[in-house]
Amino acid sequence: MIKLSEKGVFLASNNEIIAEEHFTGEIKKEEAKKGTIAWSILSSHNTSGNMDKLKIKFDSLASHDITFVGIVQTAKASGMERFPLPYVLTNCHNSLCAVGGTINGDDHVFGLSAAQRYGGIFVPPHIAVIHQYMREMMAGGGKMILGSDSHTRYGALGTMAVGEGGGELVKQLLNDTWDIDYPGVVAVHLTGKPAPYVGPQDVALAIIGAVFKNGYVKNKVMEFVGPGVSALSTDFRNSVDVMTTETTCLSSVWQTDEEVHNWLALHGRGQDYCQLNPQPMAYYDGCISVDLSAIKPMIALPFHPSNVYEIDTLNQNLTDILREIEIESERVAHGKAKLSLLDKVENGRLKVQQGIIAGCSGGNYENVIAAANALRGQSCGNDTFSLAVYPSSQPVFMDLAKKGVVADLIGAGAIIRTAFCGPCFGAGDTPINNGLSIRHTTRNFPNREGSKPANGQMSAVALMDARSIAATAANGGYLTSASELDCWDNVPEYAFDVTPYKNRVYQGFVKGATQQPLIYGPNIKDWPELGALTDNIVLKVCSKILDEVTTTDELIPSGETSSYRSNPIGLAEFTLSRRDPGYVSRSKATAELENQRLAGNVSELTEVFARIKQIAGQEHIDPLQTEIGSMVYAVKPGDGSAREQAASCQRVIGGLANIAEEYATKRYRSNVINWGMLPLQMAEVPTFEVGDYIYIPGIKAALDNPGTTFKGYVIHEDAPVTEITLYMESLTAEEREIIKAGSLINFNKNRQM
């Protein structure tokens, strides 16, 4: 079904894959690297003149309503006067959260006023989810788009799209660049044709299951090529493509064909089509060979999209597999709540409590059509099981309504909702306690569906394709593979109508900036002042997390908490609240120590500094010139969302560093850097504990020599001082200065002086 090459490969024009060690052609590997689609797009957007060290200018930007407020505030504080490139502000994340009174609506009005003031594009609530709007109206062949959402992926249309934290978008708004080393490029070589009952989520989950745990494509570009591409509709490709984020890849791109041309022309943008193919001989750093005809209906069980099984395999081994998930749930809940699954097995079938088809992965036209085909004339039943369907945009919704598909779904008992990303991150349709929800959405991290373990609640999500979800719904909630039905061939041609966008979307980039005032609600606050880095620092260990991976959902919860993202200090109260509830108070206490230092008082750390002065070479350290900050240790932090708040929330309550064995994603590490924190790493198992201090002398010099090791000294409460070895991976010159300045905002202010 899926095979991974052990080394690099050459791809010939006849689709022959040649292992690097067996290649005998004349072209050199370095020259053949230029034959990938990724090279052609990156080179056309690179401004550095050096393809090893890229400085990328994007064609457009995209943000939604739980990220754009902070981005605009940061850019404004950094001197921005107008949006220099098309910037789309959508309102698809907190648009249904009944949290905090007016705060969500206030964010939306702020977004509209920002689009009017600076010349942006504003998509009101319920009109479209961010990535469907970008597909329909912005993406095209050979383009690059940067979004403040990790699922920013438009590769099937020939666009290399990247999800990053808000700081990287701010740089583009200030006419700066996205700076990275040239990434590895991995071919995803598709052959065959999927069975009619196999959908895009099945293909995506199979790939994720094969590459996530071994890091095969981490921070690399996935380039989809091969004869199997032409067997897939553009809708199908889009739904596979958006899930590549869950592999931890950097970006994605597909070869394009007349099918893509027709799709863009249908949306009134045929001129944005560009035929993209690898050169006759192209070199890839790896190859994922996918036989589409061998893919079966899949399920990703809690608590990660990589926890993948064939549905048939699960149904044949329910007891063993479900017990493994129950054991994992006990670890995830830390004894605060319980999830039981074996009690949901009735007569040898797993009974689920909810089905959801939504968002940029599930809510697309063909997925909803498939669900309707399975449910036409059927019933979801009148027990606990329920089904909700969220079309991904109003144009999609409108065509489904015109074709009678909405009526078919409603008649079967499904609930039809507007374009909303809530089920993807816990802001809508939270299941019942101890419930299992099957969803065609993007993620199934712990508690991302909205449950609150601190309140004794635990529910979970399994990811599936819309086809198998609909088959399950037609079977009253008993887990059913789409292969058990034969109803998948009737897919009427989609008719796109731009009228909802013409009537509701504010096109400020065309109209230009008006310089009218921004409209602030009472919850929208400016970023607090942050201090610059000193030569020597003291870190207090405020959290130590030894889980294999720490997600951004654990660092700062999603769901209703997201509504507070316009208030940096208010949101920070929720930092690590589900994983380490004592962290916030410990970090705030450390921040108070720093405030006292700035006021000339370090008396509370007299003993700590006395022990530091006993370290050879540190006898003359000045405590008043030594910054004090909190630190989080995690083995592998940052899997998941691009949200900059995963880092900023630590920073605004005293955070000064992370220490990790490795960082799960480039985007989280960038967020740490842009918020003025040190992205420290250590190979050894940490011996420090929460409450210990770590003294690091000469940290500015260490910043100027990334990749080299340097010493830290652990000040234990009741033990001798011990040495640890730290390092930082590659940092650009600008990133080093951002950390020294204390934040991206400070760095930009310094440049204006």
Swiss-Prot record:
GO terms for biological process, alphabetical: response to oxidative stress; tricarboxylic acid cycle
Matching Gene3D superfamilies: Aconitase, Domain 2, Aconitase, domain 3, Aconitase, domain 4
Keywords of this entry: Iron, Iron-sulfur, Metal-binding
Intrachain S-S bonds: none
Cofactor, free-text remark: Binds 1 [4Fe-4S] cluster per subunit.
Superkingdom of source: Bacteria
Residues where [4Fe-4S] cluster binds: 360, 421, 424
UniProt-recorded Gene Ontology molecular function terms: 4 iron, 4 sulfur cluster binding; aconitate hydratase activity; metal ion binding
GO cellular component, as recorded: cytosol
Cofactor: [4Fe-4S] cluster
Signal peptide location: none
Pfam family, one: Aconitase
Coiled-coil regions, chain positions: none
Family: Belongs to the aconitase/IPM isomerase family.
Entry protein name: Uncharacterized protein YbhJ
Gene assigned in the entry: ybhJ
